[in-house]
């Protein structure tokens, strides 16, 4: 993994130089940080502005790592996806972490972590989604401004009780993720591909695969885990696409071991797609932020009227809808909330 690979992935002629590489990388919000860190490793001369941008990105990554460790100790949540993947990159190469993804063992742990974040940080946005009906899974995303909110992305932490949410149709929610860390990282990449199957892999995805080639994998066991989590087709496509840009190393044997798993998974998905039953996602429209309800372990669902579902959480209250709420629906929900309101 080196700057030459970045030139190829971003379709930049090396003769155009590092300034053009950095310019091209700015099509993505976080990729410039990876490019800058790679250029520093190469000894490329850069000015104060570029170094300050890289410093802020490094501070952001370190802060995410501290957040994950601290929340893990006090609530039991743990990081999946981007942050663990960053740990597989070579020293000095800064893998961007746009969103810190955390999976909680249960809803109580999730809300404990959310309360901790709201208490310790200037959180401005809290988004809530419920997956399924009853029982359901909860996903919460909190955001607050970066050190320089105009130049840098906001901090974004996504917490969920479903480690792998599936596609809502043929691939179900898989709430628990239990595997060796490199395999978990491969699962996370395959799950991401499940949600965008028609698109080519982003440069960062190819780089993630390159980082994982530095780890060891037992081919048959890894393929069996990917199949058990219903992600054999996505993993196969992901590795095939990455192979067009770099040697797969130990992942080449994993790709070969996936071949016998593909037909069975495609058959299961065809059978599941034939059924009209799917997973409903209900998104919360914020009605109001509240004083933190420290005595609440979980959220509460209220249905004061047909078609009006309210979600009262330890930090805010929401109207739940499968589609964006209209102003009329929101006003009716606020009226219903006031009627049901009691001291918490």
Protein language model features and the residues they cover:
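Conserved NTP-donor binding/palm subdomain of two-metal-ion nucleotidyltransferases/polymerases, i.e.
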Residues: 1-98, 104-344
């Amino acid at each position: 993994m080196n700057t030459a690979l970045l030139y190829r992935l971003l379709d930049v002629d090396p003769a155009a130089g590092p300034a053009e590489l950095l310019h091209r990388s700015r099509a993505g919000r976080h990729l410039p940080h990876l490019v800058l860190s790679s250029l520093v490793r190469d000894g490329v001369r850069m000015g104060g502005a570029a170094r300050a941008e890289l410093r802020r990105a490094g501070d952001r990554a370190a802060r995410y790592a501290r957040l994950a460790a601290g929340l893990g100790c006090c609530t039991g949540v743990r990081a999946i996806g981007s942050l663990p993947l960053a740990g597989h990159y070579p020293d000095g190469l800064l893998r961007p972490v746009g969103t810190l993804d955390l999976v909680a063992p249960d809803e109580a742990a999730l809300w404990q972590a959310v309360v901790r974040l709201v208490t310790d940080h200037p959180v401005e946005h809290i988004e809530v989604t419920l997956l399924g009906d009853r029982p359901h899974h909860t996903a919460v995303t909190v955001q607050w401004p970066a050190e320089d909110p105009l130049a840098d992305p906001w901090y974004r932490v996504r917490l969920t009780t479903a480690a792998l949410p599936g596609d809502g149709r043929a691939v179900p929610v898989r709430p628990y993720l239990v595997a060796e860390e490199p395999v978990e990282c491969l699962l996370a990449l395959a799950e991401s591909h499940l949600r965008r199957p028609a698109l080519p892999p982003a440069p960062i995805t190819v780089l993630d695969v390159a980082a994982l080639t530095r780890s060891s994998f037992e081919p048959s066991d890894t393929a069996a885990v990917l199949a058990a989590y219903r992600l054999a087709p996505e993993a196969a496509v992901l590795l095939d696409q990455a192979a067009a840009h770099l040697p797969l190393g130990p992942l080449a044997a994993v790709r070969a071991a996936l071949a016998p798993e593909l037909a069975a998974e495609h058959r299961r998905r065809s059978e599941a797609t034939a059924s009209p039953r799917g997973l409903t996602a209900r998104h919360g429209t914020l009605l109001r932020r509240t004083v933190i309800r420290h005595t609440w372990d979980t959220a509460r669902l209220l249905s004061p009227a047909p078609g009006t579902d309210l979600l009262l959480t330890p930090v805010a209250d929401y109207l739940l809808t499968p589609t964006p709420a209209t102003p009329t629906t929101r006003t009716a929900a606020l009226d219903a909330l006031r009627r049901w309101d009691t001291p918490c």
